[in-house]
Amino acid sequence: MFEYKGHIHIHSRYSDGGGKVKQIAAEATKAGLDFIIITDHCNLDGLHKGEEGYQSGVLVMIGMEVNQECNHYLALSVKDVVANNEHNPQVVIDEVNRQQGIGIIAHPFEKGSPYYQKGRTYEWKDWAVSDFQGIEIWNYISQFRDECTSVLKSIYLIFNPVAGLSRPCSKALNILDQLQTRGQKIFAYGGSDAHGMIIRVGPLPVSISPYNLCFHLINIHILSKRRLSGDLQLDKEQVYEALKQGRSWIACDYYRPSDGFC
C-alpha cells in the first residue's frame, strides 16, 4: 500500500472562496499535500473548465457541495451538477449514488455564534436519510465559528485561528459509531471548509480560513493499492477507490504529521 495525504472540502472563486484553483493548488504543494478535492457550492464549473489535473505537482480533483441553507452534502466523483434539495436531501443522496459518486454529510452539528455571520448555522437536519457514504466528523470552520463566544475571543481567534481547533465533533462521532455498529459501510471524513476569505478588522486585512493554514490542519490520508502515476484518470480512480473502501484516516497534521499512522 502507498500512503498519500490530501485535503477535501475547499472553496475557490467558483463559489465563495477567495482563491483561484491554481493558487489553491500551489498552496497545497507548499503544504506537502498529494491531492486536493475542490467542493464549490452548487456548481462543477472547475471541472467543466478543465481545472482537474496535476497543478504545481498536486492532483486537483473537482467535486461540489450541494444545498445552501441546511443539509449540506459533499458530492465527490460526480460528472453532472447535483441539484439542491434542502427539503428532501434523500433526493440529493440518490442522485449522487446514481452517478456512482461519493456522498458525505457535511458539518452536521453547529452551534453558531452571534459574532460570526449573525449566528447562522448550516446543520444537517434530516437523519431519516440512508445510503450516504460518509459523515464529516471534523470541520475546521464550524469549530472556529462555534468558538467565537465573545467579542474578545472572536478577535483572539481571528489572529490565532488554530486556537479554535479542538477535536472531532462528539455528536457526529456518536452517530457514526451507531451506524457502523449496525453494520453500515459509512466512513469518517474531515476537512477545513477552507475559503481563503479576506475581511477587515479595523484597518487590518485578515484572512479567514487561509489555504496555507488549512492545508496543515484536518487532512485525509489514504492507502492506495498502486503508486500514483501522474495520469489524471488513473490517479483519480486510485484516490476515489481508497475513499470508497475506507482505506483512509483523518488527522490534524498541524502540530505533528500523522504520516505512517497505518
Please provide the spans of the model-predicted regions.
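A metal-dependent hydrolase metal-coordination microenvironment
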Residues: 1-153, 166-182, 191
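Flexible glycine/proline-enriched surface loops and loop-helix/loop-strand junctions
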Residues: 156-160
